[in-house]
Amino acid sequence: MESTPFNRQQWTSLSLRVTAKELSLVNKNKSSAIVEIFSKYQKAAEEANMEKRRSNTENLPQHFRRGNLTVLKKKWENPAPGVESLPESTRNSSAEVRHRGDPPPAEVASSSASGVEADQGVCPRPRFSSPPEVPYPNPRIKDTEHLKDHSAESKKMENCLAESRHEVGKPETSENAEASNKIEKYNVPLNRLKMMFERGEPAQTKILRAQSRSTGGRKISENSYSLDDLEIGPGQLSSSAFNTEKSESRRNLEFPRLSDTSIKDRMAKYQAAVSKQSSSTNYTNELKANGGEIKTHKLEQKENVPPGPEVCISHQDGEKVSASENSLAACSTPPEDDSCKSQVKSDVQQPVHPKPLSPVARASSLSESSPPKAVKKFQAPARETCVECQKTVYPMERLLANQQVFHISCFRCSYCNNKLSLGTYASLHGRIYCKPHFNQLFKSKGNYDEGFGHRPHKDLWASKLENEETLERPAQLPNAAEIPQSPGVEDAPIAKVGVLTASMEAKASSQLEKEDKPAETKKLRIAWPPPTELSSSGSALEEGIKVSKPKWPPEDEVSKPEAPEDVDLDLKKLRRSSSLKERSRPFTVAASFRTASVKSPKPLSPPMRKGWSLSEQSEEFGGGVAAERKQMEKASASEKNGSVGKTTWPSKESRGGEAAGRSKEVQDFEIGSENLIENGASLDEGDRDLLQQQSPLEPKSKNWSSFADNTSAKEFTTQKQKSQDVEFWEGEVVEELSVEEQIKRNRYYDEEEDEE
């Protein structure tokens, strides 16, 4: 009993042999009856297996034969009968592929381990066949020539051999592994291998480019190598048929191998082929002839094949690939390699019209060509940009409002920047607003011309020249009558230059603010009701500095109707009676009363003065006179006492110590002062001057009430004259003095205050 290497196919017989050996080793001294029984059983089992295998392979059709070596030997030795049975063998091989499932994916991983055998590729085997024994020399020579001309086929055989080696381990077939060892020792001469790879590799890459371009990465079909073997020789028919079967069976696993060559290499070879395309015209006729042969053989193969889209597509693939390989077969010498490449390229570039196919094949080809059109239609819409951010708008975030395209996130109120929707927006002049701000700024107040700087209605009402004039007027300095005032100021008569300049400054500043912040200033301008403080005509400097002052004078004093003629008579009397020194002194000092009240207003308010009695006011007057008695000759003393006398004129009636003529003059002066109020002079300025004087006087005279009885009627009357002079000046000079003169007098007053 000879010991042979363990093979998975012969597990039954080998297990019997091992058992017999073990028994013989263990029972050396005992009888060998058990060993003989086992050996007989083993031989009987081997014979039964061999007979069963022979009967199966001989009775079954060719595509179900599981690799009997004797059948293969006969095919190699007698190649002539194989020529006749070529169409039948190709049909059966393709049918077997469809009956059989796809091979396991593990077969791809081991395909790289069989590189030497794939390159030699001498004996291609059907599926499940064991390695054959050494072939005869004549087929070997033919096969090496075949490989040298078709290296693409050798690469396919590499994968097929790897697959068949994995399938060998199945228990349906039986053969020893000696033949596989011999195949591994078999060598093709190195120079032939070198020539084969140098010539065939570019052709392989060109074929791969042709397939990937024409069919979009479809798998290699069953026809790709069986049809072009017609031109080779009778010895190669069976090998090509078996190779066709295996390439078709691995159609779903072949696509990763198509991309082994890098894109850069393929691009370089493609450019080289295009540059030499001019020499390809000689082979176009050959291509047509080969196409005719392909057509006939393909129709023969289609006889027993049920139509299916994948099969039809594979027929087209086989047609294109085989046409390119037939052109390679025509080029047998190395100098013609470049022309072969260029012809392959021309074959790829020519539109390959499918040969007469079944309707299913036509439908599949039409369905293949339709998707690119759909892609073009999808790219047809124009690129849209958002009105606000000027970026691309995609359909998911597109919002069409006011005939403009927005992002959903960019559709916001241009005033408050709140996010809006199609139901909560309003538009004016192409701008988007939320409805509350639109109503506030435009609709409810009729402010379409002012809001946000839009002035469509004013353009209709007034000409452009008038608009330009209104813009240029703040830069000029016209007279009081020519200046258009704001609606709140127009109602009152404008008599003072100070009020004029202040209103001009306010107007200019409001226009500057309007340019920077149009919305806010407009909201301020439309305030209602208009302010009425200006109708009482406050002083110019107080308006410029915008000091908040209490409401003064009281309404009962202002509302007394008086005649302006009495004022003129009284002023003439005062001007005659006063000396030149007394008349010129107020011009130097009196204007400073206003700035004093602006610079340091004291917390004493006029309503507190209303609560005082007449006796307290007279005592205050007496205390002020006693404190300043030594400084009566100075201008500051005359000012202060005069103003005190002016505002405390009601005390003269309660005391009753004055002459009747003097009291009449004081009453006339009262009338004149109230009329001056109506004409634009301010009575509350004098009251502020009084408050300014009282506050420095209080710390000087804490016992000011004790001096009230010491005052004489003569001093009181002289002070009344001076107070009348001061009041006369206040009513007269408002129209004569300019702002610059008032500033000069303010400086002079500050120096006098320091002297005190």
UniProtKB/Swiss-Prot annotation:
Residue numbers carrying Phosphotyrosine: Y225
Polar residues bias: start-end ranges: 274-287, 638-651, 691-721
Segments of this protein annotated with the region Disordered: 44-183, 204-377, 508-726
Tissue spec: Widely expressed. Highest levels of isoform 2 are expressed in lung, spleen and small intestine. Isoform 2 is expressed at higher levels than isoform 1 in most tissues except liver, fat and kidney. Isoform 1 and isoform 2 are expressed at low levels in skeletal muscle, heart, stomach and lymph.
GO MF entries: actin filament binding; metal ion binding
Annotated localization: Cytoplasm; Cell junction, Focal adhesion; Cytoplasm, Cytoskeleton; Cytoplasm, Cytoskeleton, Stress fiber
Residue numbers carrying N-acetylmethionine: M1
InterPro entries the UniProt entry points to: EPLIN_Lim_dom (IPR028740), Znf_LIM (IPR001781)
Region (Required for interaction with MYO5B), start-end ranges: 489-509
Feature: compositional bias, Low complexity: 107-118, 533-542
Motif Required for interaction with NPC1L1: positions: 164-166
Protein's recorded name: LIM domain and actin-binding protein 1
Taxonomic source organism: Sus scrofa (Pig)
Gene: LIMA1
